[in-house]
A protein has these predicted regions:
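Extracytoplasmic segments of membrane-associated envelope/inner-membrane machinery
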Residues: 19-90
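Acidic/histidine-enriched alpha-helical segments
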Residues: 16-18, 85-88, 134-143
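Hydrophobic residues embedded in beta-strands of well-ordered beta-sheets
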Residues: 17-19, 38, 45, 96-98, ...
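Extracytoplasmic/luminal low-complexity segments enriched in Pro/Gly and acidic/polar residues
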Residues: 111-146
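Short, well-structured beta-strand/strand-turn elements
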Residues: 3-17
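Short secondary-structure junctions
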Residues: 2-7, 74-83, 128-131
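A mature extracytoplasmic/lumenal domain signature
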Residues: 13-15, 23-27, 52, 90-92, ...
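Soluble extracytoplasmic domains of inner/organellar membrane proteins
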Residues: 66-123
Length: 146
């Protein structure tokens, strides 16, 4: 249990002297470019090599950062895998706004209060039939073709 990635370990002995070891690890959420560390679901930051996860490319204020992590954890894994880069991108109207670069060539504006809408990303992108553009889930729910 001294490994920072390990959440829990269970050891069970079964018939015929067989031992089963069950290891539960913390999920690696994203790479924080500001600290050059990977962020785990328990909000700890660790040094790792060769993990393919989204990259947070700029500073996020602590209160927004913690809320972002709490909301990000709830996203479907299939959606998380489509995110390439995460940028905190507030404007005068919305201090909770983020801009996501997606691996499929699209972009998404999202606000923390609507983060769960990202779970509908695949469904929304299917409806635009392969066109590339920006999905606005911050102030409205629409797709703008590039």
């Amino acid at each position: 249990k001294s490994n920072t990635l390990i959440k829990d370990v269970k050891i069970k002995k079964r018939l015929f002297n067989k031992i089963y070891i069950y290891v539960d690890e913390y999920e690696v959420l994203f790479y924080n470019q500001n600290t050059s560390k990977y962020v785990l679901e328990n909000k700890k930051e660790v040094l790792l090599d060769g993990i393919v996860v989204p990259t947070l490319i700029n500073y996020v204020p602590d209160t927004k950062y913690n809320t972002f992590i709490n909301k990000y954890i709830l996203l479907d894994d299939k959606v998380k895998q489509k995110i390439s880069e995460i940028k905190y991108d507030p404007n005068t109207i919305d201090e909770d706004r983020f801009f996501l670069y997606m691996n499929d060539g699209n972009y998404v504006y999202i606000t923390l209060t609507k983060m769960e809408l990202l779970n509908k990303y695949n469904e929304a992108i299917t409806k635009v039939e392969g066109k590339k553009g920006t999905l606005y889930l911050d102030s409205g729910n629409y797709f703008e073709i590039r």
